């Protein structure tokens, strides 16, 4: 039995609250159970130097955790003077996931920066960040269309992410912290609305996993992501 008493194929309660902050062009509070992340999208009328004059835009992301988002206080990475390898890996994953569903040529020479700030962590912060970041990005793009700066959306598809794993010998969906810290296998899956994979990150923490277990985990991920895509559409009223 899972610590949360959920069935193996059950997601935590998911909420997407749009327009959560006042200033950003797009903002969302995403909740996967007790994991809570604020995702904001900021439009900048400039592009990185490597894209100047090329007629296309860029979508990138930054990720961070508040010092007391976890059980004991963490030192701010800005105070330490450098980002951890984990932080860099996660923010690159978020950026890759969003660019996978964005036609950068249609975005024009502008950049949209997504900031994902974890205010409470209980497992799945990167997958919650990707899922919420898409909604924040979509809202920022709607604003550009409404302002007449874009004639059509550059978004080609939705994108969402979920964790799966093997916990006490059973493949399970959407691991919370207790499961994540005690699982035999941990996997993060990022998929588009059309059912294509952006990324699959899987690691055996102890006993190696079988091909059958991998297939079961991917099946659970498809189910969970289908639910997340529906949550996104409902939040965006599409």
Curated annotation (Swiss-Prot):
What GO molecular function annotations does the UniProt record carry, in alphabetical order? 3'-5'-RNA exonuclease activity; tRNA binding; tRNA nucleotidyltransferase activity
Binding locations of phosphate: 86, 124-126
CDD domains from the UniProt entry = RNase_PH_bact (cd11362)
Q: Which EC class heads this enzyme's classification?
A: transferase
Q: Name one Pfam family in it.
A: RNase_PH
- Keyword hit for Iron: no
In the UniProt record, does the keyword DNA-binding occur?
no
Quickly give the catalysed reaction. tRNA(n+1) + phosphate = tRNA(n) + a ribonucleoside 5'-diphosphate
What InterPro entries does the database record attribute to this sequence? ExoRNase_PH_dom1 (IPR001247), ExoRNase_PH_dom2 (IPR015847), ExoRNase_PH_dom2_sf (IPR036345), PNPase/RNase_PH_dom_sf (IPR027408), Ribosomal_Su5_D2-typ_SF (IPR020568), RNase_PH (IPR050080), RNase_PH_bac-type (IPR002381), RNase_PH_CS (IPR018336)
Tell me which EC number(s) this protein carries. Answer: 2.7.7.56
Give the GO biological process terms.
rRNA catabolic process; rRNA processing; tRNA processing
Recorded hits in HAMAP family, A to Z, give:
RNase_PH
Q: What does this protein do?
A: Phosphorolytic 3'-5' exoribonuclease that plays an important role in tRNA 3'-end maturation. Removes nucleotide residues following the 3'-CCA terminus of tRNAs; can also add nucleotides to the ends of RNA molecules by using nucleoside diphosphates as substrates, but this may not be physiologically important. Probably plays a role in initiation of 16S rRNA degradation (leading to ribosome degradation) during starvation.
According to the record's subunit comment, the protein's assembly and interactions are: Homohexameric ring arranged as a trimer of dimers.
Q: What family name appears in the similarity comment?
A: Belongs to the RNase PH family.
Q: Which protein, by its recorded name, is this?
A: Ribonuclease PH
The record lists the lineage as: Bacteria, Pseudomonadati, Pseudomonadota, Betaproteobacteria, Neisseriales
